[in-house]
């Protein structure tokens, strides 16, 4: 498996992976809500690549995009030491070390870039993700009550952080 920076050529596979992830109910988008096309996604990848406060990595296995992690660093003096993470892994590749490999790359990049705090959110009932994040050293910081509406019902999110 190769972990590398995303390229514009990844746009189509990235959109397909996101559609699959949206169907899980654990991501921000509802199934079918994501309206991005390949050209718009290519531009978004190019913008992230050009943004020094962003870092976008993908995991590729046999020329197939199987996971990603987006790192969105604070843009101001007071929060540039902190970065928010978004992770997604193809359901067929979970439990095979894809997420761990992506996290390890982010930890290395963060230390080089002077990022000392990583944070993420996870839907409270997404126990596999919560357990993975805990295994990777993330600590529960708090609970965001009724932060999302899923199938018409309020759902809480956990805030988690890791200090480097």
Q: Which residue stretches match the model-derived regions?
A:
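A short beta-loop-alpha structural element at the N-terminal edge
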Residues: 2-16
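Glycine-rich acetyl-CoA-binding "A-motif" of GNAT/NAT acetyltransferases
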Residues: 64-67, 128, 154
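Conserved G/P- and acidic residue-centered "switch" motifs that form tight phosphate/ATP-binding loops
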Residues: 97
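Conserved GNAT acetyl-CoA-binding A-motif
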Residues: 103, 110-121
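Conserved catalytic-core motifs of GNAT/GCN5-like acyltransferases
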Residues: 119-123, 134, 139-155
């Amino acid at each position: 498996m190769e972990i590398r920076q995303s390229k514009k050529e990844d746009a189509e596979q990235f959109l397909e992976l996101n559609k699959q992830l949206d169907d899980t109910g654990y991501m921000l988008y509802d199934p079918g809500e994501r309206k991005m096309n390949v050209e718009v996604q290519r531009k978004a990848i190019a913008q992230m690549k050009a943004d020094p406060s962003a870092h976008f990595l993908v995991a590729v296995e046999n020329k197939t995009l199987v996971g990603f992690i987006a790192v969105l660093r604070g843009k101001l003096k007071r929060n540039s030491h902190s970065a928010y993470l978004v992770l997604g892994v193809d359901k067929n590749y979970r439990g095979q070390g894809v997420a761990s490999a992506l996290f390890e790359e982010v930890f290395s990049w963060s230390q080089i870039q002077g990022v000392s705090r990583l944070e993420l959110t996870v839907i409270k009932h997404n126990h596999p993700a919560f357990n993975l994040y805990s295994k990777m050293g993330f600590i529960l910081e708090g609970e965001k009550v009724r932060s999302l509406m899923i199938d018409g019902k309020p759902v809480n999110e956990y805030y988690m952080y890791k200090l480097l």
